């Protein structure tokens, strides 16, 4: 971007304001994107990340069945197309999910810390149960006691529940990055995830969070009334991300036909920027896993020029 003609500072409420970092990430080329770091964090550019993630998730369930192995997975919400596809594949090929122990990644809450019940029509846990669990043939479903979602009673011990069920941590966390650079609702510039340094940040467990304004906007769908979108949530913490043994992510565009450059930008900040609290999802760089990035997401970020007529 030509800043010689007109330059300015990013708004203070944006988590990342370092212009050098922003320019570096913005200028990452398609041919430079596929990498694997020393931790085994692999970036793959594919036409349809959702299909790739669905196949990977099916493989996890298949292996848990044929190896008769308990498998603890933290699931994001709501991924209807992926979840129904995975369940349908299991139904067609008679793959049992009996060994899957599922934990919902996050949920909405009110200003008093009350967790949204799964009976609420916008409950993230409710959508997960409908879109994943209920899509399995009854004889292939996990026991209901193995499906975990947030309640008022478990929010203060949710990380411990994952840790206990998974013998130290989840076997797999499935995720995607939000507009503000979060994973789950681990939002930057919030009291819940304030820390003096990265080491302390990585110790923060599940809890209640007053969400960043960009998260509220994204949760509204970008078009719904903001006052009808909960401002608060409950979520896993960085501790849960770091202690999971494997990680599976997808980055694919959601808005205006792939023209939303801010989504491409936050993807690059997570993948190629410094590991930092300002981009919480950047901590995945410290873990083993695979992230599938869409070809649309990998397109160059080119600002529109104003042309005098």
Regions found by a protein language model. Give the residues of each.
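ATP/nucleoside-binding phosphotransfer catalytic cores, i.e., glycine-rich phosphate-binding loops
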Residues: 2-20, 32-33, 37-53, 236-309
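Class I SAM-dependent methyltransferase SAM-binding "motif I" and its flanking Rossmann-like core
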Residues: 175, 182-234
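Glycine-rich phosphate/diphosphate-binding loops that line cofactor/substrate pockets in enzymes
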Residues: 56-69, 241-242
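Glycine-rich N-terminal segment of FAD-binding domains in flavoprotein oxidoreductases
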Residues: 63-94
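Ligand-binding beta-strand-loop-alpha-helix segment within the catalytic cores
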Residues: 19-41, 50-54, 95-174, 227-228, ...
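A short secondary-structure junction signal
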Residues: 159-160, 183-190, 194-197, 259-263, ...
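Gly/Ser/Thr-rich loops at beta-strand to alpha-helix junctions
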Residues: 73-83, 154, 177-182, 255-256
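A glycine- and small-aliphatic-rich helix-loop capping segment at beta-alpha/alpha-beta transitions
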Residues: 86-97, 119, 188-197
